[in-house]
């Protein structure tokens, strides 16, 4: 029973971490979409990229985009892909994965919901209970300056690379806190140098060698989003659970 309880705890923790990291990724879009336009065609530097993050547009209000998430399990050479869409406004985020399996992740302040239609179940989490880990990942995005990013991560400019036909600047982030490194060893971000919007992000899991990649498309800054877009409405009969993660 103890072993079973531990496995259940690990499963809950992994599901929670996955949702938190997805939140961070989405806010990463917010951060880059808020940045100024291209800094020119000269050779880029780390300081130059960080300055772009320091110039995040204070008028940014909201965002919508399509998302593709690819999970790679190295030991069995397995690759799974899911696609969906996201809405972001302030500390609210709605991520709706549509294929191959429907799943909704809703964040409103300190509340996080994971709704699985196939199970007719919604899991409810309090982000405040995991504030240290959550803050570590959310530093990737919402309202984060280059200086704040450097406080939480060892930031390295890996160079420039053409990705999906776009010239990108590639950053590597290594978490400074041991708690974060226990989950994610490194993060890579590719930024389109013509717009400073993200093209791709990669999260490398600690120990296993597994990783997942997030690609963005159809990014629209400042769509008109109201509170109704972020209300936790679930179909009648949905089971509500609060896992202890």
List each model region and its residues.
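N-terminal secretory signal peptides that target proteins for export/translocation
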Residues: 1-13
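Gly/Pro-enriched, hydrophobic low-complexity segments
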Residues: 36, 123, 133, 150, ...
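Short, solvent-exposed helix-to-loop capping segments enriched in aromatics
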Residues: 57, 133-150
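Short beta-strands and strand-coil junctions in structured, solvent-facing domains, enriched
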Residues: 73-75, 94, 101-104, 114, ...
